[in-house]
Amino acid sequence: MSIRKMIALHPDVAGDPNEELSVAARHAMFCAALCTSCADACSAEEADMRQCIRSCLDCADICEAMTKVAVRRTGENVDVVRMLLETCLSTCELCAEECEKHEHEHCRLCALMCRECAGDCRAALPAFQLAA
């Protein structure tokens, strides 16, 4: 079962799950797990990794919130989805920057996932931009 398929089956979606948002939700879910794992691994390192741990845990929480809101299709809350996509994008970029400061393999993988998630959020944003 995939997030995209589940969303497509929602009665209010009529078979159009918003592919970009579905991908962003899926990768934000993965990003949350990787950030949590990276924070845990950082806590076992001998170096002072407090800022990296904080960045990873903040990113995990934002990604989880974005995923939960993005998969809801009953009613509309376009402004909230847009704000969460923007926040997720920014938080993932900040977390990636922090992880890239460290040479640990878990930080490298976390940074890669954060960059991918940020790109997915960026791709999903146009459907939620304010009309000019």
PLM regions and their residue ranges:
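Amphipathic alpha-helical hairpins
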Residues: 1-132
